[in-house]
């Protein structure tokens, strides 16, 4: 059973109840474990250049990759009860990347789409920050932040993750053009808006 504040149905889950009770509920999932932006960033740094073979890789892989990072940070996949089908993959209420026993991948739009990833996590409690000056968004960066880029001809078109600091300067990781520690100044190039998705 799920663990909720004020209710302990199973003595074996008492430690999870105590964890939930002493931490803000909007920062803790029902399993009693906290999301870790650092773990998400560590995954990004590790798999930024060479993709994790456990996952499907797209030719335009940016949001698929940041979803992997978020999952590594502690967010569980949101999977329907019914069997996975191409129809469930297109539903915006779910977030998963699963391979079936017959080796078919099922990956939802919120997992792989720049725009729908944003809307999914905004609904699920992420803090969002949007700026039209790079100097202003850069001041807001934290390790593990998802950053999305906008340009006039494409709209919101790319997702990356702040992966580390080197000599006091933030670096980011991303896929499509694979990298694990690019200087964040490169995010300024040819873009006119930036938004942070800070998952809790």
Identify the function of each model-found stretch:
Residues 1, 12, 29-31, 78-82, ...:
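Short, solvent-exposed loop/turn and secondary-structure capping segments
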Residues 35-111:
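N-terminal capping segments
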């Amino acid at each position: 059973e799920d663990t909720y504040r004020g209710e302990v149905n199973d003595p074996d889950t008492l430690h999870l109840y105590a964890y939930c009770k002493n931490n803000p509920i909007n920062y803790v999932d029902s399993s009693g474990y906290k999301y870790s932006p650092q773990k998400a960033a560590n995954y990004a740094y590790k798999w930024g250049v060479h993709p994790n073979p456990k996952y499907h890789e797209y030719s335009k892989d940016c949001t698929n990759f940041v979803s992997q990072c978020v999952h590594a940070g502690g967010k569980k996949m949101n999977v329907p009860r019914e069997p996975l089908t191409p129809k469930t993959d297109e539903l915006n209420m779910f977030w998963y990347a699963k391979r079936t026993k017959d080796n078919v991948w099922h990956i939802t739009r919120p997992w792989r789409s720049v725009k729908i990833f944003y809307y999914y996590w905004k609904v699920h409690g992420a803090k969002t920050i949007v700026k039209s000056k790079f100097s202003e968004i850069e001041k807001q960066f934290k390790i593990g932040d998802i950053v999305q880029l906008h340009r006039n001809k494409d709209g919101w078109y790319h997702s990356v993750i702040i992966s580390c600091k080197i000599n006091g300067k933030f670096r980011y990781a991303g896929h499509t053009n694979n990298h694990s520690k690019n200087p964040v100044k490169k995010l300024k190039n040819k873009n006119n808006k930036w938004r942070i998705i800070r998952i809790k």
